């Protein structure tokens, strides 16, 4: 019972937080629509091109789609694929649908809670969840639910906060607890000065003020994927090279701690975030 209470309390806090201002949105629908053309998903994530060029990849779902940039971008590049973005925040879903409509895209966005999607089985050819599950009450359960949505040989594109890369950033802002929110925002912009003020503030809130997050490692997620009958194809930790040994990635990821500290000392933003591309066996 205590677990259930904690579970729903976390969900409620996160929903309230994002209802106030969803992550990665702009001051207007027009600006967001233009950004899709100038910053598309294939540029951000090159390993996806080979997958999406495959005609067998037909049904795509993005879990925790937020403002919709990822799916809207992919839909603009692959208009004939069936693409769905789901998020539990109505404000974000409405925003994403407006951007999609502005661009005359075929993708759609629906309000759904991942933890209520247990009945969706063997449906999708590709699933993504980028920067989402570490804000849920149980990241591993979320991964298991998404894995069940996927068909055999389908793909899972997962992005999570990285324990080694993220911790220095958290410490950096913990040392500023006495500062006002406005001052913290200025400090954040010293690291990552995005040109659109609302966009920058949505990033700042998400990165610095979020009420709940968990940190993860390649080693941890690799073991979980193995238990779910998935094979990791590549990871951002080694710049998505497909030729790797697990032990080398595990050693490499630990070095991200010092890299993160060095970037902060140089007043540079370091994401503290890693991505894994996995395939269901």
Language-model segments: which ranges?
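Conserved alpha-helix/loop element of class I SAM-dependent methyltransferases that forms part
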Residues: 31-56
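Substrate-binding/catalytic lobe of Class I Rossmann-like enzymes that use SAM or dcSAM, i.e.
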Residues: 171, 180-246
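Class I SAM-dependent methyltransferase "Motif I" SAM/SAH-binding loop
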Residues: 64-68
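A short glycine-rich, Lys/Arg-flanked "PGG" loop and its adjoining helix->strand segment in the class I
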Residues: 141-152
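Conserved class I S-adenosyl-L-methionine
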Residues: 155-188
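Class I SAM-dependent methyltransferase SAM/SAH-binding core
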Residues: 69-111, 115
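A short SAM/SAH-binding and catalytic strip from SAM-dependent methyltransferases
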Residues: 126-137
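A short acidic, Gly/Pro-enriched loop at the edge of an enzyme's catalytic core
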Residues: 118-126
């Amino acid at each position: 019972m205590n677990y259930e209470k904690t579970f729903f309390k976390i969900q409620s806090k996160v929903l309230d937080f994002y209802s106030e201002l969803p992550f990665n949105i702009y001051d207007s629908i027009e600006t967001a629509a233009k950004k899709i053309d100038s910053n598309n998903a294939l540029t951000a994530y090159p390993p996806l091109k080979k997958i999406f060029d495959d005609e067998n990849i037909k049904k795509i779902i993005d879990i925790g789609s937020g403002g919709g940039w990822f799916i809207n971008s992919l839909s603009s590049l692959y208009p004939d694929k069936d693409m769905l973005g789901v998020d539990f925040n109505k404000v974000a879903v409405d925003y994403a649908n407006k951007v999609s409509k502005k661009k005359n895209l075929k993708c759609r966005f629906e309000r759904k809670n991942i933890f209520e999607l247990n009945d969706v089985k063997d449906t999708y050819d590709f699933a993504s969840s980028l920067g989402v599950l570490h804000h849920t009450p149980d990241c591993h359960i979320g991964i298991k639910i998404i894995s069940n949505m996927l068909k055999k040989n389908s793909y899972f594109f997962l992005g999570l906060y990285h324990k080694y890369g993220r911790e220095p950033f958290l410490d950096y802002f913990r040392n500023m607890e006495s500062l006002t929110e406005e001052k913290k925002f200025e400090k954040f912009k010293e690291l990552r000065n995005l040109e659109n003020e609302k966009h920058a503030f949505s990033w700042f809130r998400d990165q610095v003020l979020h009420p709940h997050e968990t940190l993860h490692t390649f080693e941890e997620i690799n073991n979980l994927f193995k238990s779910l009958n998935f094979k990791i194809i590549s990871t951002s930790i080694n710049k998505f090279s497909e030729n790797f040994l697990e032990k080398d990635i595990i050693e490499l990821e630990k070095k991200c701690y010092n890299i993160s500290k060095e970037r902060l000392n140089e007043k540079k933003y370091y994401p503290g975030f890693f991505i894994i591309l996995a395939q269901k066996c």
